[in-house]
Amino acid sequence: MDIKEQGVEAYDEVTAGGVQSHTGAGQLYLCATPIGNLEDITFRVLRILKEADVIAAEDTRNSIKLLNHFEISTPMTSYHEYNKYDKAKVLVEKMLKGMSVAVITDAGTPGISDPGEELVRQALASGIKVSSIPGAAACITALTMSGQATR
């Protein structure tokens, strides 16, 4: 089964009217957050964070700084290494009822050295559309700062 058949798309459709689901079920958004400077966040991530029904955050104490900085009032819940199995079940149930969930970590992309993979696994198994919203990436930043040839 290829990625498209599993319901994964690198880029989802976000309209002026809000986050758009194609299945009637909700949707899972993996939202990349800045890796150092809050202003490195993308407009698209900001829009999804504002329009999602709930934000699942690795550490709500850190994430509240990001949300407050951009005046985002979306309800937030914790989703971290120590609750990822149980919380994934709760979040999947919400998405099956039509809610959209945006996942953020302290810095970077959910699922890359951060919680996210279990929620993605359960969402896909439940037929929920999963979208990854790109942003700052430590590996690209390190490569461009290295002076190494990239061609």
Language-model features: locations:
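Structural motif
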Residues: 58, 79, 104-106, 131-133
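Class I SAM-dependent methyltransferase SAM-binding "motif I" and its flanking Rossmann-like core
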Residues: 118-151
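Glycine-rich, flexible N-terminal cofactor/catalytic loop recognition
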Residues: 2-82
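Short glycine-rich anion-binding loops that position phosphate/pyrophosphate groups of nucleotides
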Residues: 35-38, 106-110
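Loop/turn-to-beta-strand initiation segments
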Residues: 26-28, 98-102
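Acidic, metal-coordinating catalytic cores used for nucleic-acid/nucleotide bond scission
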Residues: 83, 107-115
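Glycine-rich, highly charged phosphate/nucleotide-binding loops
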Residues: 83-91
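Alpha-helix capping/helix-boundary segments
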Residues: 61-63, 108-109, 138
